Amino acid sequence: MSGTPPLVDDAVRWVRPHTPRGGPSAVTVAELQERHWPAVREIYATGIATGQATFESQPPDWARFAAGKPAHLRHVAMDEGGTVLGWVAASPVSARPVYAGVVEESVYVHPSAAGRGVGRLLLQALIASAEAAGVWTIEAKIFPENTASLALHQKLGFEPVGVRRRLGRMSHGPHAGQWRDVILLERRSATIGS
């Protein structure tokens, strides 16, 4: 993985290759790079269209996406043929030094790969690389209706912090015009700052 500290490379390496339950082929987790962007953008757009993934109404361009997410906190999951099955990325929650170890993550899995353990592999890779980089808290903001994502995050140690009531108004999809609640979850490092 180019451009990442060696510890991050080592932390991510343990999750690959892996055969998800119900999946016919091994899945490789790698650093998300610009060459993956067309597939990542498509998966992002598919998630947006469901109305259950984000308030965003369209994916950003590569430059905007990459600018806010450090390379060592961006990963893709690919099958043996190199097809991108999903992605995860995290960005700092604040520029203030006191929050230097706090990030917010997003994880998206292509519908054809849902239920095969891809999301779990991606979040495990992010957790490992985040801890290797000194991150002590990973936050996730999830719509209450997205029960699969809530369950996945809780299985990996994310705990509900609270509900942000009517956090934003949807501009698109099946919930267009509605004010939506978001559940805030966080995963606190067991090794950093404990």
Label the model's feature ranges:
Residues 114, 140-150:
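Conserved beta-strand-loop-alpha-helix junction that forms the acyl-donor binding cleft
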